[in-house]
Amino acid sequence: MAEYDIAVIGGDKRTAYMVPFFQESGYKVICFGIQETEEAEMEAKHSIEADGYAGSLREAVDSADVIVGGIPLEKKGVLDIRELSRLIRKRHTIFGGVIPETFRQECGERNIVCCDFMQVESIAVFNAVATAEGAILEALRHKDTNIHRSKSLVIGYGRCGKILSDKLKGLSALVTVCSGSQTELALADAYGMQTLALDQLGEKAGEYEYVYNTVPAPLIDEAVLQKMNKDVLVIDIASGKGGVDYKAAKELSVHALHCLGLPGKYACRISARCLTDYVLGHI
């Protein structure tokens, strides 16, 4: 029988805040690897005084049947997905975000329940809202102009792009949506946005004060960066390596920021509650 009910591994302030929420519901929790920030580490250690803090991933996994990871689940220097794969057993239920497809397939083959937070539409939408708000906050923090009446370009009109565009429009920004999809452009137009075909990005890039990228593909390359306004601020919220050539941006003195994990940075407590509620509803 496992010594603890839930092992919380890796992640950021969101996973740190999940610990006391689990405990409030009567679960014993052991933690490992919540090291994104000193605040998160302190929060986790404080919240599990009555439970435990593992000295290794193996100890955490062996100690509980429910494993809750961060978003993303795998984090260099904190959680190696290959090591986790070697340690988990059929008795485990795994939760985390942006879980590699190969890991999820392996879990399926081994009859291990594996739930990706970001495959749950309600969580993904909640995450997109927090990401959009965080992107706007980053823009305000790093540029000394108003968003009101600013010429703002949003690249991509998926879940994040739609919500971000709408929130910028609500702040009276002059929003243009750029996409390679005619359907996305038509939808953006229907919601009152200006639109720009992706193949015109280089030609029009210099017209904008703020550029928000949501597409995880190398769209903002050196050629596009060369055309940008010298005072532009690029906020890249795309996952993985993002969508900006950061080496070229530095050489061209274009202010570009890759802003990952914004919900964990600015909306950690409410995000943690959302994730906790999902886990508790599925164990």
Which residues does each PLM region occupy?
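A short, basic/flexible loop-to-alpha-helix module at the beginning of a structural domain
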Residues: 1, 136-146
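N-terminal ligand-binding/catalytic initiation module
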Residues: 1-105, 114, 278, 282-283
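Glycine-rich adenosine-cofactor-binding loop
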Residues: 7-17, 148-168
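NAD(P)-binding Rossmann-fold cofactor-contacting core
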Residues: 26-44, 171-191
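Rossmann-like adenosine-cofactor binding region
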Residues: 57, 72-93, 188-264
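Rossmann-fold NAD(P)-binding glycine/threonine-rich loop
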Residues: 98-115, 237-281
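A glycine-rich, Thr/Ser-enriched phosphate-binding loop motif common to dinucleotide/cofactor-binding enzymes
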Residues: 121-140
